[in-house]
Amino acid sequence: MPLILAGPILRRTESRAVTVWLALKAPRQVELKVYSTAGGTGEIVDRPLLQGTSSTVQLGKYLHVVAVTAAPIDSNILTSGQIYVYDINFAGSRESHSVIGGQENERENLISSLWPATSELSSLGSATISYFNHQLPTFALPPQDLNYLRLVHGSCRKPHGGGRDALSILDNSIAQFAGMANSRPHQLFLTGDQIYGDDVADPMLWALTDAGDTLLGWEENLPLMDEAQIRKNLCTSIPENPAKRNIIREARENSTESQIPKQAAAEYKYKKPVQLKPGTRSDIARDFGGFTAMLVNKPKNAKSHLFSLGEYYAMYLLVWSPVLWCDRFPKGKDICENAKQAKTWDREAAEMASFSGNLWRVRRAIANIPTYTICDDHDVSDDWYLNREWCYRVLGKPLGRRVVQNALLAYAVFQAWGNTPAQFERGKVGDKLLESAANWSKSAGTDDLAWENVAKYLGIPRIDIETGLPKFKLDEDVLILDRDEEVLNWHFTIRSFKHEVIVLDTRTWRGYPTESAIDPPMLLTHKGFEEQIQKPLQETESLNQTGEFEIEATLVVVPTNLVGLWIIDAVQKLDVEQGKVFNSDAGDAWNFHELAFVKL
């Protein structure tokens, strides 16, 4: 197995800073250098302009992650109209010897660390991440003339979604114009779910559980409370409106009973991921986690829901890189209990094979274009934080809270770090999160203080010790999650010479109505509008006035629907009136809350 498990992925890229993300199987000191090219064409590597060094963070026995940022050498900055090259070198860590069998401080470079021996390359595709003979990745900054700006937009990406993985098409687009700075794609915005935590193919979960436990070097204890404990927890009155009817209690009383045998539920308070088999997790996700993806008679939507931290980590590695994929999945008849399940398994395995076959193209593409992502719902689970009832029913259960925290930690490491590397600088909240995550893993999931700190930095709301339910607090006329002040932000702004992109977070900045727990929320609170939209625009105006930028165009990425189709709106309004808010993500669009819609 090569040193690099996933990456390099070119992330936040500006004239004075370039960030590259990697996942390695062993600890390393990682050095990133950005070079000019002769004539700006990308063909011949010239002199280094930016340089940076960073150490990997150990998140598992065989999982070491880094987002290394290169800063200017002397007064060099990057400009438009030029193609730049970057290279990475790895220095052995004091914590372990070189993977390739050399001495402790033997250096490895990017090319030697990407791929295994040639004889093992059959399932990995082309052994290159470059479009040039020098075999190194390249990029170009957005142009000064907006007429030449090339932005690429992608949305959700589900491995077993059917059809070809469209992200692989980007590889052809870059290859066609690789040597033309103003014609090749300049930025990639992936504004949908980069993984699906809920809707997972059975063969994929089979691979993820094994890979996740191996990467961590330990098996997580997933908290499954027995039915009596859950009922007691959920039937506690909601503190904000004690006079109101208890929607959570009513929902619990009206729901179907768990399919899990009572004896087994009472006997096991904790289970390992491997004990929760592919295709069997829908009832567990609903009854022990409170999740809603499988409601409206769609158990298949959560039959292989991710639960463990290792599974969420491994999912990112498998959708971004071909390295950890097996050559072939076992046949359904050898895994499943009946013919129907076996047929589903074999169909999904074929879709997985099709998906993985083009991953080398995806890997090369995202190594050669600055890539930005958002925090969407399926990165955690369907309907994540949709309304107050969702928060109560999921965060009020140990398994639900654990899964949300696992998913958000994985998102922070694999996505947010590259979007906003400044948040992860030494002493910042992201750095504290990584330290806590490393401590949690080193303890094999037993360091409660580390896990509490992870929750704090991720903005997981506090729990009421009397009710076991998440706390809310009043913010002007709406309720917001009672989170710590020192939390990671998922929203960000990226500016170039003539344009900027403002990416909103409409999941964790919601304002929930005080009346009913199922009423549609404001997708951004009043403070959210100020922090995520007004402040960036004010900063841009100031930067334009000082001459540092000349922003002529502003793009805003709004994760949820701005305006829905009238027929969808009609169905969702009926669902809200009937209390069936999880039937159709009712209320997860801007036009459902008039004040927020007008303000936007």
What are these regions (language model features)?
Residues M1-L600:
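Extended recognition/assembly regions associated with phosphoester-bond processing machinery
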